[in-house]
């Protein structure tokens, strides 16, 4: 590792220590809360990053059998699910399955959009809230604003459409090994004291699998502010940039992330990794 890289890490740490809010002591390993609280995570100095979105969908990018595998080299992984499943091993394999519903589930909502950006969707949502509507920003494929269908219909000049769909199945994750298939309810917390390898890629130590607003699932990384910025700066400005430029960009990136941390509230995480947010790759990522 080059002296300049070590110096950059030292500067990141010192600079960010002065910038960040105090980080409260985290819960003990294996005792993570199952209720994802986005505000609490920010107060504790953490971002929740949606690494893989829409898991379980037909085009989610997973293998045909739709599984996701977590492994470690030395230490054990721990899995805890909302429905009480606990598992400890060096390999965890989760498979997403479509399970038929006994009774079809009808979903209805009023939809505004699509919008070209989160900012324009958020402005519409704020406008609707001022008029008394329970508006939420969502990102199923494009930025949209949703309000419940049972609220008094706004004037047609608002240019909304009625979304109606009946679902006869839902996507459920299962913990699968050679001995059993265990149904999991989310959020699902997976952690280790060492870095976790996910589908062959080296990531971090703490993850959630959480259901989103669209019936699919998201792999969410829990990461502290300073580590998040280390995963942003090389792609926003370049790690070889002058140190003063790196420090200035660190302030800009942190401010942007905090200001935009409500983008994916409806899906239980703060930020994504693509161009809808700051470009981010886990700082420990190795292929």
Where are these regions (language model features)?
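Conserved, single-site charged/polar hotspot
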Residues: 2-287
